[in-house]
Amino acid sequence: MLLIDIKKQLGDLLLDVKLSLPSSGISAIFGRSGAGKSSLANVISGLTSPEEGRITLNNRVLFDSESKVSMPPEKRNIGYVFQDARLFPHYKVEGNLLYGCGGKRTPHFNDVVKLLDIESLLTRYPHSLSGGEKQRVAIGRAILSEPALLIMDEPLASLDLPRKHEVMPYLERLAKEIKIPILYVSHSLDEILRLADNMVLLNQGSVSLSGDITSVWGSPLMRPWLNASEHSALLEGTISELHSDHPMTKVTLNNSQQGIWVKSPCDCVEEGKKIRLRIRANDVSLIKQQPQHSSIRNILPVVIEDLSEDKENDVVAVKLNLSGHVLWANITLWARDELQLGIGQSWFAQIKGVSVTQSDLCSK
């Protein structure tokens, strides 16, 4: 487990973080530019030091201001992948990778090369690689050092969209196949949706919220950080049925019998596969009685848990309980008043099957 309790002054920003992160999975650090995300990563890695506090990784003290312990970066056993790959230009790809594992080619070396699909790059120099290829090599070098923690600081930020699409499948494979805990710094919700198990919301140098990704994503505290089209809930479940006649897939939510029909994702259409889906609040409507004839494929029983009014934008955010899962619906103030919505009322949430697109789905 990574335990952080530090303070560091960064110009006008005070980085004041108290946080515990699990020793497995991917923990995403999310926040706006200038929130202190990269500064926090640098403090953990030892590239910079806080004024006061304590950092431990798996019960190993990395920094303690009281006992004057400040372990240098090379002793912390932390891998770091930066926004720019920072490969050694005078080494070929193989040399860069071997640097990560002490110069010896081991079975682990071959596994990582295969995982990242970089065998064809081994004899090339960094200057001849695309941005996406450089990042894959940088990730491989960091993994080969067998770190106790891998920090990835916006690894896709410097890439154009095609290169991001090139690298993302490899990051998804890493999330599933390597056992190293990863701290993933990003301001991209799409990246976090596809990769993270846990999420930390950092605001002006302090932690506003942390926990498993579905609870943080569905929290009202996330809404100010998102524009109207991004207001959404994350749901996790298992593919339980494939429609026999149409390209539609039923996802049964975790710890529930409730199912949601979505367009079949092209990369994970098999029963029993775990999947995560994003339901946008603008795609959810409410109806009091279940209709008998409707083109909408998902009409789900819900209970209103909260209503949050935004008069400036004429929107009411309705927090719904869907079989123990959080769902959000954005409606107008007019609809709220006419329907006389109130906390504790039972309604039906309507979600069109086509509203959940490929970008809203990922396998887990």
Swiss-Prot record:
Residues 1-229 form the ABC transporter domain. InterPro entries: AAA+_ATPase, ABC_transporter-like_ATP-bd, ABC_transporter-like_CS, Mo/tungstate-bd_C_term_dom, ModC_ABC_ATP-bd, Molybdenum_import_ModC, Mop_domain, P-loop_NTPase. Its EC number is 7.3.2.5. GO terms for molecular function: ABC-type molybdate transporter activity; ATP binding; ATP hydrolysis activity. Its main location: membrane. ATP binds at residues 31-38. It catalyses: molybdate(out) + ATP + H2O = molybdate(in) + ADP + phosphate + H(+). It is a peripheral membrane protein. It is found in: Cell inner membrane. The keyword Cytoplasm does not apply. Residues 293-360 form the Mop domain. SMART domains: AAA. Keywords: ATP-binding, Cell inner membrane, Cell membrane, Membrane, Molybdenum, Nucleotide-binding, Translocase, Transport. It comes from the Bacteria. It is an enzyme of class 7 (translocase). GO terms for cellular component: plasma membrane. The complex is composed of two ATP-binding proteins (ModC), two transmembrane proteins (ModB) and a solute-binding protein (ModA). NCBIfam families: modC_ABC, PRK11144.1. Part of the ABC transporter complex ModABC involved in molybdenum import. Responsible for energy coupling to the transport system. Belongs to the ABC transporter superfamily. Molybdate importer (TC 3.A.1.8) family. This is Molybdenum import ATP-binding protein ModC. It comes from Aliivibrio fischeri (strain ATCC 700601 / ES114). The gene is modC.
